């Protein structure tokens, strides 16, 4: 362990410092950082831009953590013990290699921000209790492999930001209309052709709201409304005409558009040896 890392641990312990930043230190294992798991007092741990491939179960010993940042590592799996961090409010796992989330992951009672952008996750990756995370205010799932967004998304009623950009989504569930506190919705770069009329329940057209939906193969009537502006889209999907057309469209069960995103070249898919060169 480098002297600087050792010094960080010692200073945090001696001065009772609540925040520890170990970003960009070439760390390949948390177990190599002697004394790290004895810092039970810390509330923030930043390990972004390292070379971690796993998170050891010992992470549960950092029981006062409120912010945990693993952005831009090579993490392929998480221990079930991560859900025992009951004070956690902000968890950043963006830009890793996760294919699945551990069972019990949804039992974090205070989690407000969950960053999972740029992994290898899909609708089958989520544990059964994932949508018990009812305290979530921001959920980032962009740059993953979701084709379907589970209907249970409607349980996350405190969501203000939902980012689903650059997945393989072929539809959105009607339950998305239950997210009445939503201020930002990012669905650009998917395979969406229609929007559920229930989306019209949401107010996403104001100056402080964000609705991004470009680069989708919309059916012509929706594409025409996008030419006029977002407010026209929402006005249209609230109309009886659209509700009728949407019903007909869903009954016909059309073939979904082909995938247009080649994700085989994603960094998160490359063998680790190739990535480290």
Swiss-Prot record:
Classification via SUPFAM superfamilies: L domain-like
Record's keyword terms, sorted: Acetylation, Leucine-rich repeat, Repeat
Domain of life of the organism encoding this protein: Eukaryota
Segments annotated as LRR repeats: 41-63, 64-85, 87-108, 110-133, 135-156, 158-179, 181-202
Keyword Cytoplasm part of the UniProt annotation: no
UniProt organism field: Mus musculus
GO BP term, example: Ras protein signal transduction
Name this polypeptide is given: Ras suppressor protein 1
PANTHER family membership: PTHR48051, RAS SUPPRESSOR PROTEIN 1
Region (Disordered), start-end ranges: 1-23, 250-277
Basic and acidic residues compositional bias, start-end: 7-23, 256-265
């Amino acid at each position: 362990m480098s002297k600087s890392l050792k010094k960080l641990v010692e200073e945090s312990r001696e001065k009772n410092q609540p925040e520890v930043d170990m970003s960009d230190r070439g760390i390949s294992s948390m177990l190599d950082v002697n004394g790290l798991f004895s810092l039970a007092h810390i509330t923030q741990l930043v390990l972004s831009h390292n070379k971690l491939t796993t998170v050891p179960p010992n992470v549960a010993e950092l029981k006062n953590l409120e912010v945990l940042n693993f952005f831009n590592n090579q993490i392929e799996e998480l221990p079930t013990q991560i859900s025992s961090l009951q004070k956690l409010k902000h968890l950043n796992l963006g830009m890793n290699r996760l294919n699945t989330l551990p069972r019990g992951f949804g039992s974090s009672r205070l989690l407000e921000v969950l960053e999972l952008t740029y992994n290898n996750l899909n609708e089958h990756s989520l544990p059964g209790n994932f949508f018990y995370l009812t305290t979530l205010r921001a959920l980032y799932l962009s740059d993953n492999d979701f084709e379907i967004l589970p209907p249970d998304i409607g349980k996350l009623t405190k969501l203000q930001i939902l980012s689903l950009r650059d997945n393989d989504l072929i539809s959105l569930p009607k339950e998305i209309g239950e997210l009445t506190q939503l201020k930002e919705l990012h669905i650009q770069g998917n395979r969406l052709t229609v929007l559920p009329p229930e989306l019209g329940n949401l107010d996403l057209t104001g100056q402080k709201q964000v609705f991004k939906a470009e680069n989708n193969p919309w059916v012509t009537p929706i594409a025409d409304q996008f030419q006029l502006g977002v407010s026209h889209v929402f006005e249209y999907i609230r109309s009886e005409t659209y509700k009728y057309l949407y019903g007909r469209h869903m009954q016909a069960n059309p073939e979904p558009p082909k995938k247009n995103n080649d994700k085989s070249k994603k960094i998160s898919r490359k063998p680790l040896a190739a990535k480290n060169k």
